[in-house]
Amino acid sequence: MSNHVNGVNGVNGVNGVKPVFPENAASKEYAKALDAADPLASFRDKFIIPSKANIQSKRLAKPNISADPCIYFCGNSLGLQPKATAKYMEAHLDTWASIGVNGHFTKIEDSPLDPWWVMAEQAAGSMSKLVGAAPEEVIAMGTLTSNLHLLLASFYKPTATKHKILLDWKAFPSDHYAIESHIAWHDGLDPKKSMVLIGPDEGEYEIPTQKILSIIDEHADEAALILLPGIQYYTGQYFDINTITEYAHSKGLMVGWDLAHAFANVELKLHEWDVDFAVWCTYKYANAGPGSMGGLFVHEKHGKVDYSQGEDSPQFRHRLAGWYGGDRSVRFKMDNKFRPIPGAGGFQLSTSSATDLTCLNASLSIFDQTSISELRRKSVQLTAYLEYLLLKDTTDETRPFRIITPSNPEERGAQLSLLLKPGLLQRVADKLQSASIVCDKREPGVVRVAPAPLYNTYSEVWQFVEQLKAAFQE
């Protein structure tokens, strides 16, 4: 598609077609024109953007919304605070203060929150739309690694012959530790022999889908499960979840996905893609706050509860159980007969933190006002504009960095990972910090830049590239 707004030739295409920019696209005026034509521009006002002064301060400071804002491209690490968070938190605290324990079951008419005991389901309803699932297949609970442990306990069923887990060569350390510990938990299994790392070719960072399928073929007779990141945290590569899941299933593997960097970033269709299970955090692109409550997905085929053998003999997928996973209709009978909630809710353990769920529901209320497809459309354009400006008037030989994130929009999310030439990382990081630009650096030489469609602008992308070029020239 082509947009012509205010005389500006807009970007073309989203679905696998890289946006194309005109000759004048490298100008500040063009970036401003893109912002003026942005249908999601008003969402920026729903967030508190740290001021340049505050971002440099080492003392507590009240947010100064009218002040000169910093450029915040670190939503892949921690998203910004929604203005709704304070409103929701005030309602939660007032509920607790005014009616105490009755907050568990009482619906306050003028509160944006449901009673505490169903707030996890309130969040699940919103999250299900972001992952392409039925609400019953999703639940808000725990944190990413604890949820991963719970699901590995249910889905990793090694035998003497099928015991291997296939995983990413540069998996986030917590995923690696979780897998390693589950393998070691089973007598006779050695993580060194049962963990298969899938990596790129020498000198490369992108892992082609065909290579993943080939490794599945190579280990199919011995592999029990594959766990990959939806988006690789270091390189920003977005894996072909549908193709990999379907192929792994055809070889008899269970399939799980860590969606830490994919949730609220790219469009997902977990139910349609027949994913067995998935986990994610909510403090990155979902903006629910540092260490906020995570989420998990269990496909409906694994969440069924069968009472054909009697009310006291439900048949269900084995899991590590807790009382909050019990059916609400009988939860308070306290008869020590576990009857799980059908679906993902049956994997809950303890009473959910209403305080954490308050922050999560506040952030999700913003997503309820748009759609992941609309956000993704802008994200593709923002990141393509960033890539365009970074590469303009340079060659592989002249530029002091390499973009190790795939260039195809279908194979990446919001993030671009820049691998700097040796010795540049700290200098560039210091320059960006002094300019009140917040992005993420990863040793030994990567800067991860992630413009978020909810609150970042094309003008900020332009300013970032100007500051980055200045840092290289110093």
From Swiss-Prot:
Pathways per UniProt: Amino-acid degradation; L-kynurenine degradation; L-alanine and anthranilate from L-kynurenine: step 1/1; Cofactor biosynthesis; NAD(+) biosynthesis; quinolinate from L-kynurenine: step 2/3
InterPro entries to which the protein is assigned, alphabetical: Aminotrans_V_dom (IPR000192), Kynureninase (IPR010111), PyrdxlP-dep_Trfase (IPR015424), PyrdxlP-dep_Trfase_major (IPR015421), PyrdxlP-dep_Trfase_small (IPR015422)
Modified residues (N6-(pyridoxal phosphate)lysine): 284
Enzyme Commission (EC) number: 3.7.1.3
Main location: cytoplasm
UniProt-listed SUPFAM superfamilies: PLP-dependent transferases
Cofactor list: pyridoxal 5'-phosphate
Subcellular location(s) of the protein: Cytoplasm
Pfam families from the UniProt entry: Aminotran_5, KYNU_C
Catalytic reactions on record: L-kynurenine + H2O = anthranilate + L-alanine + H(+); 3-hydroxy-L-kynurenine + H2O = 3-hydroxyanthranilate + L-alanine + H(+)
Gene Ontology terms: cellular component: cytoplasm
Disulfide cysteine pairs (residue numbers): none
Superkingdom: Eukaryota
Broad EC category: hydrolase
Subunit composition and interactions: Homodimer.
Similarity field: Belongs to the kynureninase family.
Function in brief: Catalyzes the cleavage of L-kynurenine (L-Kyn) and L-3-hydroxykynurenine (L-3OHKyn) into anthranilic acid (AA) and 3-hydroxyanthranilic acid (3-OHAA), respectively.
Protein name according to UniProt: Kynureninase 2
Organism listed in the record: Emericella nidulans (strain FGSC A4 / ATCC 38163 / CBS 112.46 / NRRL 194 / M139) (Aspergillus nidulans)
Native organism taxonomy: Eukaryota, Fungi, Dikarya, Ascomycota, Pezizomycotina
